[in-house]
């Protein structure tokens, strides 16, 4: 079941989520399966800022899907454990992979999948790690990095797609999300909503409410009862990715590492305290030739 709802809905859901204190007490999971942090060149969102905002807005499960690396997701997972909130925020290791056919997302990964493989090869690599294959923003014409129609159909016909984004907050026009929903229905692929957030403002713009899950099998079962809630980001949000790209380029030239958002904003739980964050060096980030990283359409 899918539900499109205004941003006000997430405030109500956040209030419901905050009533729970541990994973066993969660009757529902509130999940976002497509989020970027500073380990994507087009984001400056730090691990701690991300965790603060995600908890404040009521998310319980997040798939961190940086461009062409899982190290960013590992950094969020480790920071959540360090802050003592990993029992309240389940961090799923993910990656948005730049394939030769367009972007494919893998979640529940163990290690980075190399860029440049075909979409089918990438799907096989994701499955080999015990992960799930998700297709992000498949029909957004403003993002040349999206997967092309022919390889998308081949993946679907081969049964190699586990999830498809039927609502992506960064898709400008509703008809392109609707096209994704129709494609998912045609091939009977579970649909999800995703914020595709690259900044703290966007976190939980879209999310999925479903029975709580802790692993791939439980998620696949929970998807049958998923109710997704979607709100579109303003088109101006793409300026934040452009700012992030150029900030990181300039800081790289100056030898100052990567930029990060200030650790300010919504009040975090008492046990979450602001601490200095060591930013990765430019060499540790994905290749700036990444078409997604070099575009202002993140």
Short names for language-model regions:
Residues 2-53, 71-80, 86-87, 92-93, ...:
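Charged catalytic cores and adjacent phosphate/nucleic-acid-binding surfaces used
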Residues 136-140:
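Acidic/Gly/His-enriched mid-domain segments of enzyme catalytic cores or analogous surface patches
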């Amino acid at each position: 079941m899918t539900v499109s709802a205004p941003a006000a809905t997430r405030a109500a859901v956040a209030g419901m989520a905050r009533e729970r204190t541990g994973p066993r007490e969660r009757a529902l999971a509130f999940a976002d399966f497509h989020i970027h942090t500073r380990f994507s060149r087009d984001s400056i969102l730090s691990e701690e800022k991300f965790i603060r905002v995600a908890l404040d807005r009521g998310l319980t499960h997040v798939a961190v899907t940086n461009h062409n690396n899982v190290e960013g997701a590992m950094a969020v997972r480790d920071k959540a454990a360090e802050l003592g909130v990993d029992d309240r925020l389940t961090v799923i290791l993910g990656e948005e992979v730049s394939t030769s056919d367009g972007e494919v997302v893998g979640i529940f990964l163990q290690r980075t999948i190399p860029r440049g493989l075909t979409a089918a090869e990438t799907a096989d690599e994701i499955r080999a790690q015990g992960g799930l294959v998700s297709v992000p923003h498949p029909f957004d014409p403003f993002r040349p990095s999206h997967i092309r129609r022919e390889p998308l159909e081949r993946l679907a016909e081969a049964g190699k797609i586990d999830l498809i984004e039927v609502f992506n907050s960064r898709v400008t026009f509703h008809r392109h999300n609707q096209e994704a929903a129709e494609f998912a229905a045609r091939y009977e692929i579970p649909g999800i909503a995703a914020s595709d957030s690259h900044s703290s403002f966007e976190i939980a713009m879209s999310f999925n409410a479903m029975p709580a899950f802790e692993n791939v099998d439980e998620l696949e079962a929970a998807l049958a009862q998923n109710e997704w809630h979607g709100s579109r980001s303003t088109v101006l949000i793409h300026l934040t990715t452009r700012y992030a790209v150029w900030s990181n380029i300039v800081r790289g030239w100056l030898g100052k590492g990567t930029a990060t958002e200030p650790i300010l904003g919504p009040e975090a739980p008492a046990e979450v305290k602001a601490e200095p964050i060591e930013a990765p060096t430019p060499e540790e980030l994905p290749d700036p030739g990444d078409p997604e990283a070099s575009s202002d359409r993140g």
